[in-house]
Curated annotation (Swiss-Prot):
Catalyzes the conversion of lactate to pyruvate. The gene is ldh2. This is L-lactate dehydrogenase 2. Pfam families: Ldh_1_C, Ldh_1_N. It comes from Peribacillus psychrosaccharolyticus. The active site is at H179. CDD domains: HicDH_like.
Length: 319
């Protein structure tokens, strides 16, 4: 893996998510170099120009330019945001066929550059495409990471914070599983400032589990509501991607709910799925295996099964 004094992120895909991610990187000065790659050269060039014009207002200047796949050779992270977008009424899994073809071409071109860093995948269905990137690239599983349920967990913490009138930073809760319709809340490990959420419910009649069940539905279906209102989701996921990038480049050893490869954890194998993991400069340092309730384990197994059923027709020989 490349170790340089200057951090470089290569962004592939300058659509709504990609450009929002680039904006977040510059505003937080997360990387020293950012190269933008897109099939639409004018869009990528325009983004690079626009971002450079605002660079003096950022905490630190980030060298930003429009480039090509050769620039991936010295990248520490290649973040892929390219692909077909989710349309109203379309699930993330409906996008599989279209995006697998796109990803094969993208990953092949990145690897041909001599890239030896970490892949960060955002394109949906993210768990499927992260697995595909791992297979296409031949990189160690620890160095291929998907955004997974980082945004779902962020939505979860935000809405729980609203419900209990507590800052989201003091809400500790995870959404795990597929980034999609079969994801699940881990109520057994959700707490507010160290006090279990389930205990808060029993202590105070003002709080009801029925409310929290609906709260989770709002988390799960958030993307559909946002897509219906504005056509796409991009700010939240871009900020989540920036958070993962920061954890990698700063060697933070931070616990984030990302899509990572399971090899026996949670009773599952050969699948990329959203779980809490320790993220640092090497990628995934380790997976944190939560002790799930019986119901949660069944739901997680179902989520994993759904993903495997989608993967099987495309990677049957490899599996």
């Amino acid at each position: 893996m490349i170790q340089r004094n200057i951090n470089r992120v290569a962004l592939i895909g300058a659509g709504s998510v990609g450009s929002s991610y680039a904006f977040a990187l510059l505003n937080q000065s997360i990387t020293e170099e950012l190269v933008i790659i897109d099939v639409n050269e004018d869009k990528a060039m325009g983004d690079a120009m626009d971002l450079n014009h605002g660079k003096i207002f950022a905490p630190n200047p980030t060298k930003t330019w429009y480039g090509n796949y050769d620039d991936c050779k010295e990248a520490d992270i290649v973040c892929i945001c390219a692909g077909a977008n989710q349309k109203p009424g379309e699930t993330r899994l409906d996008l599989v066929e279209k995006n697998l073809k796109i990803f094969k071409s993208l990953v092949d071109q990145v690897m041909a550059s001599g890239f030896d860093g970490i892949f960060l995948i955002a394109t949906n269905p993210v768990d499927i495409l992260t697995y595909a990137t791992w297979k296409f690239s031949g990189l160690p599983k620890e160095r291929v990471i998907g955004s997974g349920t980082i945004l779902d967990s962020g939505r979860f913490r935000f809405l729980l914070g609203e419900y209990f009138d507590i800052a989201p930073a003091n809400v500790h809760a995870h959404i795990i599983g597929e980034h999609g319709d079969t994801e699940l809340p881990v109520w057994s490990h959700a707490d507010i400032g160290g006090v279990p959420v389930e205990e808060l419910i029993t202590r105070n009649p003002e709080y009801k589990m029925e409310d929290l069940d609906q709260l989770f539905v709002n988390v799960r279906d958030a993307a559909y509501h946002i897509i219906k209102k504005k056509g796409a989701t991009y700010y939240g996921i871009a900020m989540g991607l920036a958070r993962i990038t920061k954890a990698i480049l700063n060697n933070e050893n931070s616990v984030l709910t990302v899509s990572t490869y399971l090899d026996g954890e949670y009773g599952e194998k050969d699948v990329y799925i959203g779980v809490p993991a320790v993220v640092n400069r090497t990628g995934i340092r380790e997976i944190l295996e939560l002790t799930l309730s019986e119901t949660e384990q069944k739901q997680f197994t179902h989520s994993s099964t759904v993903l495997k059923e989608i993967l099987n027709p495309h990677f049957k020989e490899a599996r």
